């Protein structure tokens, strides 16, 4: 029975991350987003501030810069409270993003995400993405 419960929790955690990625792709940062992201969300990505509201601002800026943003998932695995995702990040750069003025260019970057789930909510995030490739695609 415990193994079945653990399996159910792992599947629920994977679904939670997929729901989050769907919110980001659709730009829906409303009620569902608030229900699945912890108020004190800690994003370990360099330069990020703690908190769900700061995450919303960051993701809204990304969604504005890349309105057709997609995060197709290649692999999603989970163990305990952690969910790991290997995905692409694609989109068309139509508005300023950091130091990069809108370019109209398509980007395609590989990323690895690790999420920690606490009490049914996303609590922490680590990311390793090919940011040099992103910068190169936006500059060329």
Which residues make up each language-model segment?
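C-terminal and inter-domain tail/linker signature
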Residues: 1-140
